[in-house]
Swiss-Prot record:
It is an enzyme of class 4 (lyase). SMART domains: CYCc (SM00044). It catalyses: GTP = 3',5'-cyclic GMP + diphosphate. Belongs to the adenylyl cyclase class-4/guanylyl cyclase family. It holds the Pfam family HNOB. Residues 466-593 form the Guanylate cyclase domain. GO terms for cellular component: guanylate cyclase complex, soluble. GO terms for molecular function: GTP binding; guanylate cyclase activity; heme binding. This is Head-specific guanylate cyclase. InterPro entries: A/G_cyclase, A/G_cyclase_CS, H-NOX_domain_sf, Heme_NO-bd, HNOB_dom_associated, HNOB_dom_associated_sf, NO_sig/Golgi_transp_ligand-bd, Nucleotide_cyclase. Keywords: cGMP biosynthesis, Cytoplasm, GTP-binding, Lyase, Nucleotide-binding, Sensory transduction, Vision. One of its GO terms (biological process) is response to oxygen levels. Head, where it is preferentially expressed in the CNS and the retina. Not found in bodies.
Length: 676
């Protein structure tokens, strides 16, 4: 035989990977496999070992092969690879590399090595649940080959596999395998040898030969080795017959008249059967087929293809001999509309069953059942439950299918209700987040949470709170000369900057009334830098005034007052509640603002004491006269006075840098836990 790998140069391209990739045909890794229960997934894995072994399984088999046959082929160790090689590349095709290495190493022995590799593949990897999956296919080799044909056909249909790979059990001891990869065909030869020994304790010779006219098809012919003289070709020991009762061992008659059932009873028992002769002419119909087609046969003949469409197996040639070769494959037959028939009730009905060769009459017997999924499919095809034999499991399939459909309908309704509830919950959660966010904009976080939960909020005293009051100099005059829209637009631009300062310095905006803007620090998160934050904000507010003008082009001028002291804070009102500050310190802070001047920051003695605990704040050289102190401010001995805050310089920075740079760096430092 010519080299098994001979092919044209253009066919030496890399073949598609045989790895079970995520989302691919096999996708076995994603399923949870039971250690005990045999499932369809295990059958998939078992047959994949024959048709598309994984890189891991191949590497295991190669390792064993190298250990056993290193002396026979010194260079065989080159086939072995580090597992990381193909683990790092999901699409790596190990089998293609094995094929190329064998062609370079020893072309004459390439097929022999591949057969041995197939045997090692079964020996090393066919264990546990995979071995059980192979054993469930049949009690002997012939049954195994026949089941391999039928099971693989079903698996391909379920996985929507459009490749040409497949098995055909063409007769006793004959298997035809289709594959575009010759290397798989030779690997399968060794795998079948090892499986025969493992499962049925039989040594067989398997001859492989190409099928004439199709380079992708290979025929495997099984023959028994001489040492197994006590064993039949297909694995059944001849000694078993000794245990069978003598009455059962009687040879069956091939005379139809000796059958214990007449044709009428057979047609009644199996309504969905037919028998056809070598010319594929119908010679007998079951009661179900007879009811549908008998009126038309007198006019249109008895040719089977007139009434039946053979849908599966795929690629079946409508010749008697070819059908006989596919008797191990499930058949799916569709019912045709008879010529001239009007309103044929069973058009499109499919019958699934088995084709049996009857050598005594050289005919073919088909026995099947309607391929239905529910009562609707039954009635739509003009059938009744009575048309399904009592022994046929299709009855249970139809009735159980209806029950499952009702359960699915209930499940879908429940899922729809569940989705509606989840959508409603999601909408409620979304609205809740909006409301909570809005409350956090108006109130301190602790107060906002209590308001949302509906908890009672008691007024609370806070010590060392630094309060800022500000207003616009000449605001009444500005309002008298401008329209309300102009005034609102001016305040909107100015207060937008101030609100950003509140977020940056983490201070609480108490309220705005007209041109008055009030903030406080030390309410929601007390810190030794509360006075510093308010002072820095005051400096940035004065700086921001230079960037805003009135309607007539004049610069906005503000005056600001700062004071630090104890305040009482609480929520007032139920409709549109407000978080208000009360106490002597609030009044004094407002007085310091009234006693300030345009573009000046009037600082109380208590606030100055807090600011001077750290370097950087600059005040006017000459303190103000004590008479400028508010009358409400306690000043025993008349030694205290107020001060104008002029600027701030971070000692660690160049003094020539802008004021904003000094403030931003200092704020960043204390935010990170450092010392301003």
């Amino acid at each position: 035989m010519a080299c098994p790998f001979f092919r044209r140069a253009d066919s030496l391209t890399r073949q598609p990977s045989v790895i079970a990739e995520p989302g691919g045909h096999w996708a076995l890794e994603d399923e949870e496999l039971s250690d005990d229960a045999l499932t369809l997934t295990h059958l998939q894995m078992a047959i994949q070992l024959l048709t598309a072994p994984s890189n891991e399984d191949l590497n295991t088999a190669v390792t064993s092969l190298v250990a056993k046959y290193r002396q026979n082929w010194p260079n065989i160790h080159k086939l072995k690879l580090d597992p990381q090689t193909f683990k790092s590349c999901a699409n790596y095709d190990y089998l293609a590399d094995i094929q190329e290495l064998l062609l370079k190493m020893d072309e004459a022995s390439a097929s022999e090595i591949l057969v041995l590799l197939g045997e090692e593949l079964i020996t090393c990897c066919c264990t546990g649940i995979i071995e059980r999956a192979f054993r469930c296919l049949g009690t002997d080799l012939q049954e195994f080959l026949g089941s391999l044909d039928g099971v693989y056909d079903v698996l391909k249909l379920q996985e929507e596999d459009v490749t040409d790979t497949g098995f055909v059990c063409a007769g006793e001891g004959e298997l035809i395998f289709t594959s575009e990869r010759p290397v798989i065909a030779w690997l399968l030869l060794g795998s079948l040898k090892a499986l025969t020994r493992m499962l049925y304790k039989v040594d067989v010779n398997i001859k492989i030969e190409p099928v004439e006219g199709d380079a992708r098809r290979y025929r495997y012919l099984f023959s028994l080795v001489k040492d197994n003289s006590q064993t039949m070709l297909m694995g059944r020991p001849t000694s078993v017959s000794k245990t069978i009762p003598e009455t059962v061992q009687r040879s069956n008659s091939s005379n139809a008249s000796d059958l214990q059932m007449n044709s009428s009873s057979f047609c009644k028992m199996f309504p969905w059967h037919f028998i056809m002769n070598e010319q594929l002419e119908l010679v007998q119909l079951g009661r179900g087929f007879s009811k549908l087609y008998k009126p038309y046969m007198a006019d249109f003949g008895c040719q089977a293809t007139t009434y039946f469409d053979f849908k599966r197996p795929k690629g079946l040639t409508m010749k008697f001999r070819d059908i006989v070769r596919r008797t191990y494959t499930p058949f799916l037959i569709g019912l045709n509309n008879p010529p001239g028939a009007v309103d044929f009730p069973a058009i499109g009905l499919e019958i699934k069953g088995q084709m049996v060769h009857c050598p005594e009459s050289n005919s073919l017997l088909f026995i099947g059942s309607p391929f239905l999924d529910g009562l609707d499919g039954l009635t739509c095809n003009g059938l009744f439950i009575s048309d399904i034999p009592l022994h046929d499991a299709t009855r249970e399939v139809i009735l159980v299918g209806e029950q499952a459909r009702a359960q699915d309908g209930l499940r879908r309704r429940m899922d729809k209700i569940k989705n509606s509830i989840e959508e409603a919950n999601s909408a409620v959660t979304k609205e809740r987040k909006k409301n909570v966010s809005l409350l956090h904009l108006i109130f301190p976080a602790e107060i906002a949470e209590k308001l949302w939960l509906g908890s009672s909020i008691d007024a609370k005293t806070y010590p060392d709170v630094t309060i800022l009051f500000s207003d616009i100099v000449g605001f009444t005059s500005i309002c008298s000369r401008a329209t309300p829209f102009m005034v609102i637009s001016m305040l909107e631009g100015l207060y937008k900057d101030f609100d950003e300062f509140c977020d940056f310095f983490d201070v609480y905006k108490v309220e705005t009334i007209g041109d008055a803007y009030c903030v406080a620090s030390g309410l929601h998160r007390a810190s030794i830098y509360d006075a510093h934050k308010v002072a820095w904000m005051a400096l940035k507010m004065i700086d921001a005034c230079s960037k805003h003008i009135t309607h007539d082009g004049e610069q906005i001028k503000m005056r600001i007052g700062l004071h630090t002291g104890t305040v009482l804070a609480g929520v007032v009102g139920r409709k549109m509640p407000r978080y208000c500050l009360f106490g002597h310190s609030v009044t004094i802070a407002n007085k310091f603002e009234s006693g300030s001047e345009a573009l000046k920051i009037n600082v109380s003695p208590t606030t100055k004491d807090w600011l001077t605990k750290h370097e950087g704040f600059e005040f006017e050289l000459q303190p103000r006269d004590p008479s400028f102190l508010p009358k409400e401010f306690p000043n025993p001995g008349g030694t205290e006075t107020c001060y104008f805050l002029e600027s701030f310089r971070n000692p660690a920075l160049d003094s020539e840098l802008p004021l904003v740079e000094h403030i931003n760096v200092s704020m960043k430092t204390i935010s990170e836990g450092g010392d301003a």
